[in-house]
Amino acid sequence: MKTSVKFETIFPLTTAPLIQCITNEITCESMANALLYIDAKPIMADDPREFPQMFQQTSALVLNLGHLSQEREQSLLAASDYARQVNKLTVVDLVGYGASDIRNEVGEKLVHNQPTVVKGNLSEMRTFCQLVSHGRGVDGSPLDQSEEAIEELIQALRQQTQKFPQTVFLATGIQDVLVSQEQVIVLQNGVPELDCFTGTGDLVGALVAALLGEGNAPMTAAVAAVSYFNLCGEKAKTKSQGLADFRQNTLNQLSLLMKEKDWFEAVKGRVL
């Protein structure tokens, strides 16, 4: 794929960026370990009383809507407001957007603060763009992944960039769609098994934040994070005998794939 992304300079990370994650209990440990596997550093700090000092130390922030509660809502919104005040690099992950009105309201408030990257699966991002969506809970639907549906979403996300010109929008699925005010990229790596263990989208959000914290441009960080994770899944599939084995091998590949000099040559996609 011809793109301005210089994949060969992405890894290894050289600054050990400290990434603050306000996320859910289900995948909290997996996110923290994924960051460690790529030589970033996690801190799972969600108490607003700590934010002034935390924000002085961290390189980027992840705000994840998964497992929403009143207390977590307060933390997410407080962190989002503070991040905007201090121009903190921020990834907003719209987990389960469309599942409830409360979740939608919180998500809209987070996006209103102009985060660096906004992500979700194709169904979540269709709901965000007020398109018909067939997603259920936190899962995307195959009905939202046809070529026609993806093209419709691309056009809707282009409209969103008019309201949020500094934000890169990422929609993940059978194809991964990335839209900024300047360009549209569609990525085509990955394997179906990545939908069969929980938290894959959360891990991608953490990887995006790490690459932002390392100093990469937003589109570069998003493209590289998605591509790297999907290629880890592809490599893991060749070594696995079941889904639990596949999950472990995917996580293993986060620290291993980057050691292959030309790993990025397997990236597939197109620039529109």
From Swiss-Prot:
Pfam families: HK (PF02110). ATP binds at K119, T172. Keywords: ATP-binding, Kinase, Magnesium, Metal-binding, Nucleotide-binding, Thiamine biosynthesis, Transferase. It is an enzyme of class 2 (transferase). Its cofactor is Mg(2+). It comes from the Bacteria. InterPro entries: Hyethyz_kinase, Ribokinase-like. Its EC number is 2.7.1.50. Pathway: Cofactor biosynthesis; thiamine diphosphate biosynthesis; 4-methyl-5-(2-phosphoethyl)-thiazole from 5-(2-hydroxyethyl)-4-methylthiazole: step 1/1. One of its GO terms (biological process) is thiamine diphosphate biosynthetic process. The keyword Transmembrane does not apply. One of its GO terms (molecular function) is magnesium ion binding. Gene3D superfamilies: 3.40.1190.20. Substrate binds at M44, G199. It catalyses: 5-(2-hydroxyethyl)-4-methylthiazole + ATP = 4-methyl-5-(2-phosphooxyethyl)-thiazole + ADP + H(+). Belongs to the Thz kinase family. Catalyzes the phosphorylation of the hydroxyl group of 4-methyl-5-beta-hydroxyethylthiazole (THZ). This is Hydroxyethylthiazole kinase.
